[in-house]
């Protein structure tokens, strides 16, 4: 879950892992739909506030971009989504190039281009001033502290030109917001709808994307529950279970039979609706009913979180899982990783026979076999 088995260089899905057995599925969110939403959210904000955003009045709306992991499908999709929406993307083999631009104050980088945006009869230049992968010295990606340091470096060098901050996630986004953007009234856009980011919208955070973590967490455990009960995988998902739990396909999620993957659908969270998203750990009303323990008896699940320090996974996703595991009569052992090595996690799966089911959150999307090899 959360990190889809795939080739980190090409994005090609690891079909061997996804077809490990008849009860193997992936649960995540629709990365492309969410990426497009984030990009459009930024464009809409600029159009509505262009005269205020262009802080130095030079006619150039400059943005900086925090990239989470250059080899991660979701990070790639979000970088492409922002560049596509803003018009700054360069074609690379039929896709928008997601390569970090480094520093691009002069607009001469090879992986992005300047774009134009017409607002109320005035034409603005849109420029990606800088972008980099937020990877720390220990190798951990999506690193919030690194993002905070980056905005410090960028703002010291060309701060007056930074009009918008965009991030592949809220952890990095909030780090940059708190370090510089908030005090300088620069709108910052993230992804995940973490509770602190949603609350910060009242203080100038531009917006974020809810990837329906409540639906994702439910699906993560529900597909396991269905397999353990020997019922159709759609039970309690697209088809109501005996308790009345049921999601709406096309509104809450979509399913790809070819990819054996469930994808939660996303929604933009802005100043217009953020108050509806202030509790990120509340279970989804549609799937909040307790299962009958006589029909779905207690089972033991091993579940890892690839990085125990990841803001979204630790403050939103795991609390949701913990709320759902009781409803689904599952006893879950939660294993927190260091965000750097698979062995830090797999070394704690010494006796798989103790468990009835497994939910795997890899450090790197290439490494599904590090786990499946232990389960054969």
What are the language-model segments listed below?
Residues 1-2, 25-28, 62-66, 163-168, ...:
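Structural recognition of the beta-strand scaffold that forms the well-ordered cores
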Residues 34-38, 73-129, 146, 150, ...:
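Short, solvent-exposed amphipathic alpha-helices that sit
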Residues 1-33, 54-62, 194-203, 369-376:
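Flexible loop/hinge segments that line or gate small-molecule binding clefts
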Residues 82, 108, 113, 118-199, ...:
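Hydrophobic alpha-helical
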Residues 59-62, 66-70, 74, 86, ...:
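Hinge/cleft segment of the Venus flytrap/periplasmic-binding protein
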Residues 160-167, 178-250, 263, 271:
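Exported/periplasmic ABC-transporter solute-binding proteins
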Residues 25-58, 77, 144-151, 193-197, ...:
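Hydrophobic alpha-helical segments within soluble ligand-binding/sensing domains
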Residues 67-76, 164-170, 300-327, 331-352, ...:
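Extracytoplasmic "Venus flytrap"
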